[in-house]
Regions:
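Conserved beta-strand-loop-alpha-helix hinge in the C-terminal portion
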Residues: 248, 252, 256-279
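Short coil-to-beta microelement around the adenine-binding A-loop and adjacent beta1/P-loop entry
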Residues: 14-15, 106, 214
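ABC-family P-loop ATPase nucleotide-binding domains
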Residues: 98, 105, 110-197
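Walker B catalytic motif
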Residues: 200-204, 211
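Conserved structural motif at the start of ABC-family nucleotide-binding domains
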Residues: 2-4, 17
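The feature captures the beta-strand-to-loop junction immediately N-terminal to the Walker
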Residues: 33-35
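ABC ATPase NBD Q-loop/coupling interface
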Residues: 59-66, 73-81, 93-107, 175
Length: 279
């Protein structure tokens, strides 16, 4: 689904990613752990297309899958950006897209979701308005008609109920006045409505208490633990991985993946730290 090869990126004149290589297949959950300044958040920003992060080398190929409502996530992309890529698993007819050639909104429409460490507030824009516009923009990109208000509200209510979130919160401005836990819960509702193929979650456990962590972990599992989806979890701590069991754990240090293992590697990092393993 995602193939990152020898990725190099800078912020300003400072190299941050220095030859990072990583592959995710459908149905897999990968966790990236590492010390501060290793490049974890930079990786998420580069994949999401955030301005100010310059890719200076390498490639990122992405094979999206069709959405739950149907439609082709690559329907409106130029043919020059879509090609078959034998490195990526999936249907023989799936097209791989050069992710780095897409604008941020095109990456989202192709099936990528980026969860933020600190979800932003958007005064004056209600959650319902924001999410309906986002979902219908994706549907347009896939060559589908927009959802009516009633059709959208049915999906939104189902996702809010699944997260134990009062639907009235979706009528409020996006994240305005929300606690840290409410913002992360709201982000899970957003992810459930958007229904991405690939979720990149940057320290989504930051600032959560045990109860909120369990709710968020359950949300990730419910929405994303499926054979046609994949997750890249970026975290400092083992505790989120108690609820979202990874298939692979990677150590990111000095801009590169320096070690890969199973879930037991996270326990080793929690016990011993990064000093020996990051070398």
């Amino acid at each position: 689904m995602l193939s990152i090869e020898n990725l190099h990126a800078t912020v300003g004149d400072k190299p941050i990613l220095k030859g990072l290589t990583l592959s995710l297949n459908p149905g897999e959950i990968h966790a990236i752990m590492g010390p501060n300044g290793a490049g974890k958040s930079t990786l998420s920003y580069v994949l999401g297309g955030r301005p100010g992060y310059e890719v200076t080398g390498g490639s990122v190929m992405f094979t999206p899958r069709h959405s739950r409502e149907g439609g082709n996530p690559l329907a409106t992309l130029p043919d020059t950006l879509v090609r078959m890529d034998p490195r990526l698993r999936g249907d023989d007819e799936s097209g791989a897209v050069d992710l780095l050639a897409l604008a941020p909104h095109e990456r989202a429409a192709a099936g990528l979701f980026l969860g933020f460490q600190y979800p932003v507030e958007i005064p004056g824009v209600s959650n319902v308005q924001f999410l309906r516009e986002a979902l219908n923009a994706q549907r347009k990109h896939r060559g589908q008609p927009p959802l009516s208000g009633g059709e959208f509200l049915k999906i939104a209510r189902a996702q809010a109920d699944a997260m134990g979130m009062d639907f009235d919160m979706l009528k409020r401005p996006v994240n305005v006045g929300f606690s840290g836990g409410e913002k992360k819960r709201n982000e899970m509702v957003q992810m459930g409505i958007i229904d991405p193929a690939l979720a990149i979650l940057d320290e989504t456990d930051s600032g959560l208490d045990i109860d909120a962590l369990r709710v968020v972990g359950d949300g990730i599992n419910r929405i994303m633990r499926k054979p046609d989806k994949a997750v890249l979890l970026i975290t400092h701590y083992q505790r989120l991985l108690d609820y979202v069991k990874p298939d692979f754990v990677h150590v990111l240090a000095d801009g590169r993946i320096t070690r890969t293992g199973g879930a037991e590697l996270a326990l080793e990092l929690e016990r011993d730290g990064y000093k020996e393993l990051a070398a």
